[in-house]
A protein has these predicted regions:
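Core mature regions of organelle-targeted
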Residues: 80-90
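Intrinsic-disorder/low-complexity loop/linker signature
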Residues: 87, 98-99, 166, 330
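Flavin (FAD/FMN) cofactor-binding and adjacent substrate-gating region
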Residues: 90-122, 267-281
Length: 484
């Protein structure tokens, strides 16, 4: 799991018993209230959640607490490797404060602190600065197991299309299809668009000469060699430190900015309630706030920077954008305003672009999805192409239509991934915001399911005639005699 000592299985079992009692006390689970749907193509799930990382798991738990149990979570990765933590994330620890409680829904026994303390002891928690990446993944594995969440692994979604009667058809890479009334895209930081690879790189380098930080990288093949990293955000330093720790000879980080990023606006958001109250802002206020947010590169954590900078093979080049790249004699040649460099391999820490038109699973629906650029008018000097490409979401993370005629196509489709940033702030894919975002999403899904069936439910309610009171008056003689 990590360099922490072995798990205290007795304490963990006691915690799980406490959790079971807490769940029972707050009546977390119960029979479904939703009305079953039938479809000629097969079983109809009330909700299919695409993505089995922290967002998908927590969404599933929230729905079960609302007594919506006809659900299924899908993840393209093998069991235990959902999300980025054991696939491409290379930071040593999470970047968020250890005391956050993002996915526990207020249940003390489900918090990361309760689990960590049960596993490793209170002293280990007190000594902890931030939660190690691998330990966080172990918490998520436990979360899935202890809550018995319905997750199907090795299931990659390739398409989402309307199947009629308020149902979506969810196509999988293996040829199977599923049906669902609601589909939640809990697809992480990249799930609302794609990782950005600059055209200069795509057009001038062979594919084997570079990788994005979001991709697997064979660092063993780079032992003793020279690697260049384009970009100066947190992931650049995560990858630099990780590569050097794996035996890479030199790592050079190149930043366009002339100074290291020092301000992390997320910390301000956490302090003043920005994460919880952001959705109440007007569109223009959101636009300006997120323009400021996107102007910052998230800085590395201090410990990650210090680790990376302590390696003899580490170099940092400020004010050094890549003006040209070329592939010559098996090496990547990088030209900056100041010098020329030769590398055996380069890594791109160039961020991502959120745009539903880039998602292959949304190919049939993306033309009908409203974007911020379609909906919000800003003065010409304030327009931001990155913001304009984000989907314009409703208050419960639901996609909204570009035209009123498109409403039925999108009704029931939710974007609980990083593309929600502009509409709803730090929420999905951001541990700092999930505590507030999850109830909003779950309530919105439950409301839709209820309102979709309101005519039938109201008719049943009006016709309801099940008698509960069984007393009689005048009282029968037998009852009077028994009372005497």
């Amino acid at each position: 799991m990590s360099d922490l000592h072995a798990v205290d299985t007795v304490a963990l079992a006691a915690l799980e018993a406490d959790l079971a009692q807490q769940l029972a006390l707050v009546d977390s689970f119960g029979p479904d209230w939703t009305r079953p749907r039938t479809h000629p193509e097969g079983h109809v799930h009330d909700v299919v959640i695409v993505g089995g990382g922290q967002s998908g798991l927590a969404t599933a738990f929230g729905l079960k607490r609302e007594r919506i149990n006809n659900i299924l979570v899908l993840d393209e990765n093998p069991e235990g490797f959902e999300g980025p933590w054991e696939t491409y994330a290379r930071m040593i620890t999470l970047r968020t404060p250890k005391g956050l409680t993002p996915i526990d829904y207020g249940l003390p026994a489900l918090t990361p602190q309760a689990w960590f303390t049960a596993c490793f002891g209170a002293a280990a928690w007190d000594a902890l600065d931030k939660i190690p990446r691998g330990v966080w993944m172990e918490y998520l594995r436990w979360y899935r197991r202890v809550l018995n969440l319905p997750l199907r692994n090795d299931a990659r979604v390739t398409g989402i299309t309307p199947a009629g009667d308020g149902v979506y058809r969810v196509a999988l890479a293996d040829g199977a299809t599923l049906l669902a009334r609601k589909v939640v895209l809990a697809t992480g930081i990249q799930g609302g668009g794609e990782w950005h690879t600059p055209a200069m790189i795509r057009e001038n380098l062979p594919r084997h000469a570079y990788a994005h930080t979001s991709e697997p990288i064979d660092l063993a093949a780079l032992e003793g060699k020279r690697v260049g990293i384009l970009g100066g955000g947190a992931s650049a330093f995560d990858n630099a430190n990780h590569a050097l720790a794996q035996g890479v000879g030199e790592v050079h980080v190149f930043m366009r900015r002339k100074a290291l990023p020092r301000i992390n606006p997320i910390r301000f958001m956490e302090r003043v309630g920005f994460t919880a109250r952001y959705p109440a802002l007007s569109d223009a206020e959101k636009y300006r706030a997120m323009a400021a947010f996107l102007s910052h590169n998230q800085p590395p954590t201090n410990d990650t920077f210090n680790r990376a900078a302590s390696w003899p093979g580490f170099a940092l080049h400020l004010g050094s954008p890549w003006n040209e790249v070329a592939h010559e004699d098996g090496q990547v040649i990088v030209t900056t305003p100041h010098d020329r460099f030769a590398f055996d391999f380069v890594i791109l820490s160039t961020g991502l672009i959120s745009d539903p038109r880039l998602r292959p699973e949304l190919a049939a629906l993306a033309p009908h999805i409203a974007l911020w650029g379609d909906v919000v008018a800003m003065p010409e000097g304030e327009r931001n192409a990155l913001i304009d490409a984000h989907p314009y979401l409703g208050p419960a993370f639901e996609f909204t239509p570009r035209a009123p005629a498109d409403a039925a196509l999108l009704h029931g489709l939710f974007a609980f991934n990083y593309s929600a940033l502009i509409s709803l702030g730090l929420s999905a894919s951001a541990l700092s915001g999930m505590k507030n975002a999850l109830p909003r999403l779950v309530r919105g899904i439950a409301d839709q399911l209820f309102l979709d069936d309101r005519e039938a439910l109201l008719a049943q309610f009006i016709a309801y005639d099940e008698e509960e009171f069984v007393g009689e008056w005048p009282r029968p003689a037998s009852a009077v005699e028994a009372a005497a």
